[in-house]
Amino acid sequence: MNVLVINCGSSSLKYQLINSDSEEVLAKGLCERIGIDGRLVYQKEGLDKEITEAPMPTHKEAIQMVLDALVNPKTGAVKSLAEIDAVGHRVVHGGEKFSDSVVITEEVIAQVEECNDLAPLHNPANIIGIRACQALMPNVPMVGVFDTAFHQTMPEKAYLYGLPYEYYEKYKVRRYGFHGTSHSFVSKEAASYLGMDLNNSKIIVAHLGNGASVSAVLNGKCVDTSMGLTPLEGLVMGTRSGDIDPSIMEFIAKKENLDIDGVMNVLNKKSGVAGMSGVSSDFRDLEAAYNEGNERAIAAVEVFSYRVAKYIGAYAAAMNGVDAIAFTAGIGENTSFVREKIMAYLGYLGIKIDRVTNDKTRGVEALISTADSSVKVCVIPTNEELAICRETVKLVG
């Protein structure tokens, strides 16, 4: 069957049309500047990208343009919309309500809306995308796949904060975690690639991109993850601070005369390796600056790598051991010198890295540890769109 995968942001929309039988991407692209002037990028498999500038007042017009491109007589991937069998939607926050993917109903949409406070930038946009698809494809089944769902297997000791319990009872303040679709996909792929039994394994997944998180996956189930109530907790990221002393917020607010929104803007958008280095949130730029001897870039890379290694060590303790570590996402898949820095801290686990293989591995599945390493270390490219496609087929196929 053909599954249209939609990832809807506040002013953008990414899409892929995937044949679930062959798992081939038939077409992909994105809509940008929705609500402003509008720009559609469309690419059929095997052809060059096409870019169309056109007004997109709302997501409905954006999705209509995507559908028109998919059935275009010359460059379309399908002859008619009847060949699109299902739509899989990325939904960022499912709170405690959703521990798995679901077929979208009015009740599901209402429950997602109840989680809007937990993801005010993302959930409303996700719902807008769902509504737009329903209006344009009323008879096509829709599935919601949640970033938070995979982490719902965490035990209470991992998700509760040391705050008054009433905040959990009243407001559901707890660790939720994100990138769950990626962590789930990569842990399964890693077990398969390494010939392990997923249901009898201890795998740590390091999803290292502009947003970054680590998860502990015990016997196929997440038991801990580094992001929290929001994606701000945990690792140092591209522009996010990660873990800090909460009192820093009050200290900076007084010194810089900022309100709470101003402080949160600093922590979310002006911190991380970009804020530390003054160079960029992009590790390609950071690596170049690092190699040129830029002291702030060196410090940013060292702090980033050290924090990842600390979390991996913590999760090895949480699971009382580790069988495999899987690196994924933009930095995890492509930045070999950062992988090597992280692994250098973990020799006590018996990890030995094959430097030659590590250095040449970019964006492909690879075993980067040596044959005598106690823990297998690998690179597994993430594919959240394919994961959403598989989840959709599982429910409506």
Swiss-Prot record:
The keyword Cytoplasm applies. This is Acetate kinase. Its main location: cytoplasm. The active site is at D147 (proton donor/acceptor). GO terms for biological process: acetate metabolic process; acetyl-CoA biosynthetic process. Pathway: Metabolic intermediate biosynthesis; acetyl-CoA biosynthesis; acetyl-CoA from acetate: step 1/2. It comes from Agathobacter rectalis (strain ATCC 33656 / DSM 3377 / JCM 17463 / KCTC 5835 / VPI 0990). The gene is ackA. The record marks H179, R240 as: Transition state stabilizer. Its cofactor is Mg(2+); Mn(2+). It is found in: Cytoplasm. ATP binds at K14, H207, L208, G209, N210, G211, D282, F283, R284, G330, I331, G332, E333, N334. One of its GO terms (molecular function) is magnesium ion binding. Its EC number is 2.7.2.1.
